[in-house]
Amino acid sequence: MMEQKTVRVGDIDVANDKPFVLFGGMNVLESRDLAMKICEHYVEVTNKLGIPFVFKASFDKANRSSVHSYRGPGMEEGLKIFQELKDTFGVKIITDIHEIYQAQPVADVVDVIQLPAFLARQTDLVEAMAKTGAVINVKKPQYMSPGQVGNIVEKFAECDNENVILCERGALHGYDNLVVDMLGFDVMKKASKGSPIIFDVTHALQCRDPLGAASGGRREQTVDLARSGIATGIAGLFMEAHPAPDQARCDGPSAFPLDKLEPFLNQIKQLDDLIKGFEAIEIN
């Protein structure tokens, strides 16, 4: 049986054979007050349920479909908000970067820096992120097969950073349709020699209008998809929630309703406990 790697985010163990970690929050920082409200709710729920938690938000959505779409407050203001969240709630933070110059300043504040799916093969960006020594979350590109993630992990290892988490977010099947291949989780584990795999259930539910300027979504299918992913035995779940999804400034159609967070996570935790309590069956 292949040994599963453990990546440490502060005092949190992230591994495929350990209790799942929630990487949850909001899509983009809309305001300081909303970030505080959403983070507080996540902290209350995860503390109650005993779920390890890392808060997620973006300071700049640099890859929006339309030039007119809201991008966020920017790095300087975003890092101030992240620091306040850490000071207030004691949470770990994950956020994404898009430019080489952002790597070190962001790593100085947050606990995990994320390599966006569209940039996952950009070697110069990979090198800059690796050199910070931070934990890295790699979003698997929609165009990449599960087995190819091993090459990205190798790039980070060549730069002396093996603190890598891999994130599945669906693959393109035809135009504008994302599908999650549940067999892909095991392929990713093997290709990366046991790296922790997490599942971005929110973005996997995006459904684009081929002529539109923003992504649609299928948030009503979040529970089914999340259960399916967790049932494969993975390290964590990645999700975004909002108190009023239809008013969210980015990816509202796939955002999870914040008031449904506790019953949802309660089910996911029970399922994760059940799956990881089974004796492994090895088939050659």
UniProtKB/Swiss-Prot annotation:
**Listed Pfam families:** DAHP_synth_1 (PF00793)
Enumerate the NCBIfam families for this protein: KDO8P_synth (TIGR01362), PRK05198.1 (NF003543), PRK12457.1 (NF009109)
Annotated keywords: Cytoplasm, Lipopolysaccharide biosynthesis, Transferase
> Where is this gene product found?
Cytoplasm
Could you tell me the EC number(s) of this protein? 2.5.1.55
Identify the InterPro entries for this entry: Aldolase_TIM, DAHP1/KDSA, KDO8P_synthase
- Gene Ontology MF annotations: 3-deoxy-8-phosphooctulonate synthase activity
Protein name stated in the entry: 2-dehydro-3-deoxyphosphooctonate aldolase
Q: Which reaction does it catalyse?
A: D-arabinose 5-phosphate + phosphoenolpyruvate + H2O = 3-deoxy-alpha-D-manno-2-octulosonate-8-phosphate + phosphate
Q: Which residues cross the membrane?
A: none
Q: In which pathway does it act?
A: Carbohydrate biosynthesis; 3-deoxy-D-manno-octulosonate biosynthesis; 3-deoxy-D-manno-octulosonate from D-ribulose 5-phosphate: step 2/3; Bacterial outer membrane biogenesis; lipopolysaccharide biosynthesis
GO biological process, alphabetically ordered: keto-3-deoxy-D-manno-octulosonic acid biosynthetic process
**HAMAP family membership:** KDO8P_synth
Q: Can you cite an annotated GO cellular component?
A: cytoplasm
